[in-house]
């Protein structure tokens, strides 16, 4: 879906994918806006089945990194490698719905189907993400939390290998956040997924991530939640924007 990115891109074979378990390999990645560097020499790998959360301050490069991974930003320096026949489901930070265009949730999802990719059973996806009860409602009338679930269902319809989410719970209350993260963990097992997401919610990040990457233009530290909470660089970075 996003293999045709510019830059020094490579595609792993399926054999390579399962030998080393990596589905994304980022090496020496840099990106600049108007000569101002916002990503500086970033390298990391994503293993099959991981939940990785990217933490960092506003303006630290989290969203830029996500947009590079999904193919929106292409004029980067460095290498981004993907597994062969690799499909990404993307849930952006800001998704606007035109209230002047009548569109039910059901129509929005059905119209998202594409013939180029084998799709999962729609009814199964709708039940798993718990959006059946809002199918007849207008897209412009649903809450932000419901919109995130609809977008998540749309991602799953692509039968992706990984879902990349940019600040998916930023406008949810604490109960909705808890439910959303529990759902993500269930979907990983049911759909055989990997997940990358950005977040500011330290408590939920530590409870629901396999690995945490702390970024402020470059990577300050990374590791499991238990490792990160003991890292001085992490403590210093988080205290500055918490």
Swiss-Prot record:
- Tell me which UniProt keywords the record has, alphabetically: ATP-binding, Cell inner membrane, Cell membrane, Ion transport, Membrane, Nucleotide-binding, Translocase, Transport, Zinc, Zinc transport
Where the protein is mainly located, per its record?
membrane
One family from Pfam that matches here is: ABC_tran
Reactions it catalyzes: Zn(2+)(out) + ATP(in) + H2O(in) = Zn(2+)(in) + ADP(in) + phosphate(in) + H(+)(in)
**UniProt membrane topology term:** Peripheral membrane protein
Q: Does the keyword Transferase apply?
A: no
GO molecular function terms attached to this record: ABC-type zinc transporter activity; ATP binding; ATP hydrolysis activity
Tell me where in this chain the ABC transporter domain is found.
24-241
Which family does the similarity line name? Answer: Belongs to the ABC transporter superfamily. Zinc importer (TC 3.A.1.15.5) family.
Q: What does this protein do?
A: Part of the ABC transporter complex ZnuABC involved in zinc import. Responsible for energy coupling to the transport system.
What is the name attached to this protein's record? Answer: Zinc import ATP-binding protein ZnuC
